[in-house]
Each structure stands twice: as C-alpha cells, then as structure tokens.
C-alpha cells in the first residue's frame, strides 16, 4: 500500500467556498505541507494541474531539494506540450530528485481551459493525442532516437541525451472513466487512478481496465483519489464535514455546477451525479461523503468517520485491488498530521510502524514533558 498526500497549489483553508479561514498559496506554506508529509512517512504527494493552480513542475522543482524521501506526482499535458520536451523535463527532474518523480497523465476535461491553452481538440481527439504522445514519450526515455508520424503528432530523431534514474522511465499514473480512457490505461500506463466513487462502482471500473489490459498481455496497478475527514469519534467527523461546507451558499453551488456542466469529462459527470448539486443526503455509501464536490472540480468525495471506520473503508477499497491511496484534507497541513496520527496505526506496514514514532521513551520523549521531569504517559 502506498499512501499519498496532496499539495494545495490552488489554495487552502478551513472551509470551502469562502475566504473565511483561507490561506494563500506561498512557497513557505507548500514547503510546510511537503516537509510534514515527508517527515510523517507519506509515500508521495500529488500536485494538481490546471489554470486554477500554480504550475506543478515549478512547484515540484522548488520542493524537491527541501525534502528527502517524498515522491512527487506531477502532471504532463499531452496536446499542450511536445512529448520530446516533456520527456526531457521528466528525465531532468527524476535525476535531480534522486528518482522521486512520478508522472500523472492528464488529458484535460475542461474545453474552455483547453482552448485557452491552445488545444481545440474534442474528447476523442484528446485521447488520440495522448496515445500518440505516450508512445513517443516512453520510447524517448528508453534511449531511442524516435521517428514517429501519427494522426496528430510527428517527430523526427526525437531523443533525450540524459536518461532518468528510474528505468525504463518514471511510473505513469492516469485517470479517466470513459471507454477511451480505459483503453489507454490498459495499453500504456502503470497505475490507473479513479476518483472516490462507491466501492461497487469502483469495482466495475477496475474490472473493466483489468480485462482490457489482460487482452493486451499487460497488468495495471490501481489507485484512488479521495479526501478524508477523520476525527477521534464519528460524531466529530461528521460535524467537521458539515462545518467544511457551512459557508457555501446555494448560489455558489449552482454556479459551480454550471461551470462543471461544460466539461466533457466522463469522470466529472460521474462525480456530479453523486450529489446532483444538492446538499442533502450527501452520504452516498457508508462513510463516503460527496459534499466536497458541490464546489470543487475533480475529486469530490471524502471518507468521513473515526479512525476505525476510515481504515475499514480503506481496506474495502484495498480488497478491490487498490494499492495507491491519494488523500487530502482541509487544511492540508493539519490534516496531514491528523490522518497520520489517527489512521496510520491501523494501516498495513510500513505505516503502522511509522505511527509508532509517538511512543514515549526516556531517551526521546514525544509530547510535552509534565512538570519539570516527568515524561508524558504513553497511550
């Protein structure tokens, strides 16, 4: 099991949909989140992409030298950048990070943003471009001098002279819910990602990708993207979920859902269908809450509950074949600690052992000393 955290390069705060309790995106704050995730033992962090975010490659480049073990899941955008240039960027960052780069392949689901970035392709064409892009990208990073002519992309003598540390190339992660996305995942990527739908729906998606990959003689690993709201009691967790959206007006929800409706992303459509823009009845499966998606695009569901409930839901997804869990919580600095402290002890190794760092001992007490000479009591 690999547990990731998330870098909030599009903003952070205590609530959704309001400036109340909000935090600006600064390098110092992102450094705090990244270093906390590194110190706590998270496998890596996802850096989002899009016009509402700071650039993921610049952010990763700034944070890599400030962390020791943390991996960075960074987006590439087929159709926006040359596959050869992208491959060389990946090789460089992989070398500079000591092999800590992971690649998130993003086709882009917002036609308005895509046109602003210079891409006027429709949904099916974007997947055609992504397929051609990855064929070039993968070969370049394996040391080939590539000649390629496809429907959309053409290169001659494309090459990267400096190889990545990870061989044959940094692992490719990719998410999508359409048939075209499942075909692409089965054919070219290492880890297929899904947003946090109910377990039965996730099981269907994984089975479909698994079957398509088997027909091509391949195996694909699986991951899931979820928010998390965990507290010591279930009542506290659900209260925190309610508090997170208490400042969102109905007009704001309507405006957000109208914006999402222009997307041609099947995944976004499925996320929106979980709540239909309504704030009532947001628990769509046991401990799975769709409130985040009322105003946030992309991943819109959260695991909500006490540590045992959250761990049980994680195990439920793991039993389906999920190996990588990409979590986030508001605010991201505090919640990185809270999730590690409350849930890591209930997860498989190495996370259970990482949580054991909090055991008090006389040579290195954790927690504030009592009076002037008494260590805190172990729990």
UniProtKB/Swiss-Prot annotation:
EC number: 1.14.14.5
CDD domains: Alkanesulfonate_monoxygenase (cd01094)
Reaction catalysis annotation: an alkanesulfonate + FMNH2 + O2 = an aldehyde + FMN + sulfite + H2O + 2 H(+)
GO molecular function per UniProt: alkanesulfonate monooxygenase activity
Keyword ATP-binding: no
One GO biological process term: alkanesulfonate catabolic process
Protein name, entry field: Alkanesulfonate monooxygenase
UniProt keyword Lipid metabolism present: no
Family named by the database record: Belongs to the SsuD family.
Cited function: Catalyzes the desulfonation of aliphatic sulfonates.
One Pfam family it belongs to: Bac_luciferase
Highest taxon above the source species: Bacteria
Coiled coil location: none
The species this protein was found in: Pseudomonas syringae pv. syringae (strain B728a)
């Amino acid at each position: 099991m690999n547990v990731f955290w998330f870098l909030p390069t599009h903003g952070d705060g205590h609530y959704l949909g309001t400036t109340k309790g909000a935090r600006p995106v600064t390098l110092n704050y992102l450094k705090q989140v990244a270093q906390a995730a590194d110190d706590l033992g998270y496998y890596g962090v996802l850096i989002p992409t899009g016009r509402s975010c700071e650039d993921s490659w610049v952010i990763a480049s700034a944070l890599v030298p400030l962390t020791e073990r943390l991996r960075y899941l960074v987006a590439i955008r087929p159709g926006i950048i040359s596959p050869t240039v992208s491959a060389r960027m990946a090789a460089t960052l992989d070398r500079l990070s000591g092999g800590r780069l992971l690649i998130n392949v993003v086709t882009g689901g917002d036609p308005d943003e895509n046109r602003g970035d210079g891409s006027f392709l429709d949904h099916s064409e974007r997947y055609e471009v992504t397929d051609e892009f990855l064929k070039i990208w993968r070969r370049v990073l394996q040391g080939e001098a590539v000649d390629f002519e496809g429907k959309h992309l053409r290169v001659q003598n494309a090459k990267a002279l400096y190889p990545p540390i990870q061989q044959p190339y940094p692992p490719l992660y990719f998410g999508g819910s359409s048939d075209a996305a499942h075909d692409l995942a089965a054919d070219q990527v290492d880890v297929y990602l899904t947003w946090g739908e109910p377990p039965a729906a996730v099981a269907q998606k994984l089975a479909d990708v698994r079957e398509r990959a088997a027909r091509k003689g391949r195996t694909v690993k699986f991951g899931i993207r979820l928010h998390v709201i965990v507290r010591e009691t279930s009542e506290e967790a659900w209260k925190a979920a309610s508090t997170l959206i208490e400042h969102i007006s109905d007009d704001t929800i309507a405006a957000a859902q109208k914006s999402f409706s222009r997307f041609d992303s099947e995944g976004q459509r499925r996320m929106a269908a979980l709540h239909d823009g309504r704030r009532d009845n947001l628990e769509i499966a046991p401990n799975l809450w769709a409130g985040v998606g009322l105003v946030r695009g992309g991943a819109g569901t959260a695991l909500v509950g006490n540590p045992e409930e959250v761990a049980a839901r994680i195990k439920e997804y793991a039993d389906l074949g999920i190996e990588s869990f990409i979590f986030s919580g508001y605010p991201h600095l505090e919640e990185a600690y809270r999730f590690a402290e409350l849930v890591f002890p209930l997860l498989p190794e190495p996370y259970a052992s990482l949580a054991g760092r909090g055991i008090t001992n006389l040579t290195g007490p954790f927690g504030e000393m009592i009076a002037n000479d008494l260590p805190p009591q172990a729990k």
